[in-house]
């Protein structure tokens, strides 16, 4: 639910409710603006440069391969936990500081997540210290959240992640009627259940945020480095792993990360910049780091 959707649905009763009783702020997403980076940050309290989890796919030195961190698997598969026999999760994921800090203050943290992936190997490390609760539907989650708040005798922190708007954006696009229908349904449910969730005299601070926004990507105009004839020969710049296998590009459609031979960085940048002029920026990772794109601190994990 990025800013474009706020502008589109700002007259919805639930958005109007939030505006009347709270504040609506426009936030800048971290870079890269992707689920893996932001879900990790909100659960650990660590920015991208410290957590090391910066994209859906990236090279992980512990396994010498490109992985899908949220799945705890090698890239190129939708199967979960293909890395389980290869490496321990704690060696891949960061230990968070957020939930331990809450518990020291006497606040018990809970995390509500879709049953398809709650709990998960990723969550066992990144969300360590929080009690996980799974749900099938949003209405179920909201009712269970309300019951939890009603029964709690001590301060609690609850995090509820709803992924269906994002999922339909990926499948149909952000302007598709299917996506808009899902957003409308979400806002109707929130308005219907809001008072029921937060009834009573307990003091509750409510925050709704998006991990990132959504932008259109047209497959028909996408440039594929491994297919387009203008990029023939580019493979000579690609770095290989310890077994001599080329490291496939990581990242996603709008922020592609290339793993290149150290001695070919300048040549590769010139090669790509010339062919992508006016279509994409080609920059070295060290420039992004120096400009603070990944946060003020860079850890060895990154």
Role assignments for model-derived ranges:
Residues 243-302:
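Active-site neighborhoods of enzymes that stabilize oxyanions during catalysis
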Residues 212-253, 302:
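Histidine-centered active-site microenvironments of extracellular/periplasmic hydrolases
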Residues 109, 206-208:
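Hydrophobic/aromatic residues located in beta-strands of well-ordered beta-sheets
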Residues 165-206:
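A long, amphipathic alpha-helix that forms part
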Residues 1, 42, 209-212:
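DG-centered beta-turn motif at the end of beta-strands
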Residues 153, 199-203, 249-253:
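Short gly/pro-enriched beta-turn/loop segments at secondary-structure junctions
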Residues 57, 110, 197, 201, ...:
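Terminal interaction module
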Residues 8, 12-13, 17-23, 28-156, ...:
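His/Asp/Glu-rich, glycine-adjacent segments
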